[in-house]
Structures are given as structure tokens and as C-alpha cells.
Amino acid sequence: MANSITHNTATVSASLNEDSLTESRLPTINDYLELCKIKVVALLVLTALVGLALAPDMGRGYFVQLLSLFGIGLLSSSAAVINHIVDSKIDAKMVRTKNRPLVRKAVSRRQALIFSAVIGTLGFSLLVFAANWLTAQMTLFALVGYAFVYTMFLKRATPQNIVIGGLAGAMPPLLGWISETGQLAAQPWILVMIIFTWTPPHFWALAIHRKADYAKAKIPMLPVTHGTDFTKTCILLYSLLLTVVCFLPFLIHMSGYLYLFVAMLINIIFIYKAVALKLSETSYGALNLFKYSILHLTLLFIALFADKFLM
């Protein structure tokens, strides 16, 4: 692990010495927004909002709560930028990522690194002053887990990269909860478990669709190392496990019947799509399942939020 991280750190450091042509033009706002993976971060912030909303009301006020969510979003964006920096050479080899800002030299690595440091520092500071030290520390822990442990090591080291590294991306509901209460509790870990269980089938579906890309980039995603059919089986098994985990908020009285109805409906569809993918002799359904999984998680957390305030 140490050798892998050292190699990637050296690669990033060496890459900072880019030609002056790249830095002679200023990146656009859209370039920086693309580095932040805004759509991904928006979903993370949504899950953090739900964690905050389900926490006991500590009377902190909406503005302070908004600042806390903004801080979580900024640190998540900072991690996304680091991911772009570390993965730029891999991104250049893959169809899905070959037009990212660092690959097309719209942003230099130095500019990206400075940007990541600035928004990361701002996000951490917001969490310290608007939330509490525990939230700031836990969010920083999640950033390190995703940007360094997962991106620099796990992603390149094992086909279980998504399973192990998925914990960092599953943390926002817990972060939202502790930003309100300042304490760890059992309930938000249920929400973490949902995202943690959702992550493997979500990314494995994409990995099936982009199997050739990952193989070309020498990333040991499960379809590359164990084959497409085995990965389809794993997706199906995880979809069943996800369904069970999604019922936990209702079973422990974190939610009511509105959430239960939505969870049942969207998980039945998830399982149906996973079964269809497994039985298919092709991989055409993989992209469809990947896209649906994003809608699934979005609707699930919206249902949790709505159940809290409408029922």
C-alpha cells in the first residue's frame, strides 16, 4: 500500500510541472464545477440533509444548518478534485472520462490542487464554526478515505475497491446528523448502511458497461478480474441485501408508511432490473441499471425527508 501511495504521490508532484501554455489561460467556472463533480456532490449533500433532518432538533436555526451542509459539500468537492488530479492519466485512456478538464488541459494540475486546497479549507472552517469539531473531523476523515485511500490505493489494488472504499462515500447522512447533534448515534449508521450497500451494484453496473475501458486502464474492477457473469450475480445478491437494509429505517421507527411504500416500490424495480441483467446474454441492461440506481437512491432519501415532515 505504501509503495502504491508513494508512486501516485510522486506522479501528482511530477505532474505539477506543466507547460506554461496550460496556465496561460484561466479556467472557466464550468471547468471548476466539472472538477467538483457537482451532480455527485448534490446527491451526497441531499443524503446529508436527510441525516440532519432526522436528527433531534437542537434549535440551531436554518442558516447555520445551511452553512453546515455547504461545508460538507465543499469538502466533498475538494475530494472530487483530488480524484481528478490523481486519475488524470487513467481518465485519458477511458472514453467516459477523456474529456475531463485536466485531460483536455482546460485546468492544470497546479490550478486544480490550489482550488482543492482552497475549497477544502473553507469547507473545514465552515464545519468548525457552523457545526462542531466532530463533524469537521469526520468529514475530513471521509475526504482522506475517498481521495487518498480509495483513489490512490484501493482503486488500483483490488476488485473489492468499491466495497471497501464505499464507506467514505456513504458517510454524509452521519455527517449531517452529527452536524446537528454533535454526537454519534446508532440511527444515522442505518442510513450509512443503505448507501454502503447501494454502492457496489451501482458501480459494478457501470463497470460492466465500461469493462473495456477499465481493462485498458488496468483498473481491476470486478468484471475485468472475475468476468461479467459473476459480476451480474453479485449485483443481484447486493440488490437483495439492499432491499433488506432499506427496510431498517421503518423497522426501527425512523420513518413511517410513506417511506415504506416508496422503498418497497423502488427496490422491487431494482431487483427486477438486476434479475433482467443477470438473465440477459448481453450487457445492454447494465447502463440502464446504473442510471436507475441513481434515481433509486435519490427517491429513497427524498421519501425519508418527506416522511419526516408530511406524515
From Swiss-Prot:
It catalyses: heme b + (2E,6E)-farnesyl diphosphate + H2O = Fe(II)-heme o + diphosphate. CDD domains: PT_UbiA_Cox10. PROSITE patterns: UBIA (PS00943). The keyword Oxidoreductase does not apply. InterPro entries: Protohaem_IX_farnesylTrfase, UbiA_prenyltransferase, UbiA_prenylTrfase_CS, UbiA_sf. Pathway: Porphyrin-containing compound metabolism; heme O biosynthesis; heme O from protoheme: step 1/1. It is an enzyme of class 2 (transferase). Its main location: membrane. Keywords: Cell inner membrane, Cell membrane, Heme biosynthesis, Membrane, Transferase, Transmembrane, Transmembrane helix. The chain crosses the membrane at residues 38-58, 62-82, 113-133, 134-154, 162-182, 188-208, 230-250, 251-271, 286-306. It is a multi-pass membrane protein. GO terms for cellular component: plasma membrane. It holds the Pfam family UbiA. GO terms for molecular function: protoheme IX farnesyltransferase activity. One of its GO terms (biological process) is heme O biosynthetic process. Its EC number is 2.5.1.141. It is found in: Cell inner membrane. Carbon 2 of the heme B porphyrin ring is defined according to the Fischer nomenclature. Converts heme B (protoheme IX) to heme O by substitution of the vinyl group on carbon 2 of heme B porphyrin ring with a hydroxyethyl farnesyl side group. Belongs to the UbiA prenyltransferase family. Protoheme IX farnesyltransferase subfamily. This is Protoheme IX farnesyltransferase. It comes from Psychromonas ingrahamii (strain DSM 17664 / CCUG 51855 / 37). The lineage of its organism: Bacteria, Pseudomonadati, Pseudomonadota, Gammaproteobacteria, Alteromonadales. The gene is cyoE.
